[in-house]
Amino acid sequence: MSAETTASGYIQHHLQNLTFGQLPNGSWGFAHSAAEAKEMGFWAFHVDTLGWSVALGVIFILLFRMAAKKATSGVPGALQNFVEVMVGFVDGSVKDSFHGRSPVIAPLALTIFVWVFLMNAIDLVPVDWIPQLAMLISGDQHIPFRAVSTTDPNATLGMALSVFALIIFYSIKVKGIGGFIGELTLHPFGSKNILVQALLIPVNFLLEFVTLVAKPISLALRLFGNMYAGELVFILIAVMFGSGLLWLSGMGVVLQWAWAVFHILIITLQAFIFMMLTIVYLSMAHEENH
């Protein structure tokens, strides 16, 4: 790209989000550097992350709505086949892993799997195409733009916190506030002696609280870390491809395609893991005796 003159600048530009927030002069606008984005503080928005995640969510809804409207008992079309396979796969996963009763879990699991998969799949688009399109549309040759929402920890943590909120909600709904507090304070260590049990409460609470909080953090960081690393590999291959070394230029296309083929497994696996852990965590929240 013309906006970057060095490999370091190229990498930094591709790893920076399109950030909107309050500028140092008090006005609101887009940041044009990582330092400027940092100065915007907590209330800055990653416009590219929000835009792509919402757009892909809408695409998911429209595709499945279209398939539902055109569903037939006769010979199904390609879209209906795809949707039926997805629904059957997710439904089987929920039946195998979720041991409670809730009409919400299967639709939630389906939404998570397909939505995360679509966001991950954008990583297969060549790294320069979408940023260059953003430059052409905006007319700004220095504007940063990241299309893979799951390489932004804000997106993955936001989804994980939503799952965490459901865990807390169902834990209290199924077990009651007393049961939920008891789960945090009376396990894993217990004693028939009331005094000893009282002394164990702080230890139990510390262990269970850390375990509880670790669920959304690990859920978010696992998805973010794997997708960020995959995106970085694509960027590094692009840097080598454009380095001017002829022997590397010949290998660039091969490396890109080889990593893309392998990355198909990664993007699918990460969507599956996020979905399965969500199902397992919510199943644990529905269990009376944890």
UniProtKB/Swiss-Prot annotation:
It comes from the Bacteria. The keyword Transmembrane helix applies. Keywords: ATP synthesis, Cell inner membrane, Cell membrane, CF(0), Hydrogen ion transport, Ion transport, Membrane, Transmembrane, Transmembrane helix, Transport. The chain crosses the membrane at residues 44-64, 104-124, 161-181, 194-214, 233-253, 260-280. GO terms for biological process: proton motive force-driven plasma membrane ATP synthesis. It is a multi-pass membrane protein. Belongs to the ATPase A chain family. This is ATP synthase subunit a. It comes from Pseudomonas fluorescens (strain ATCC BAA-477 / NRRL B-23932 / Pf-5).
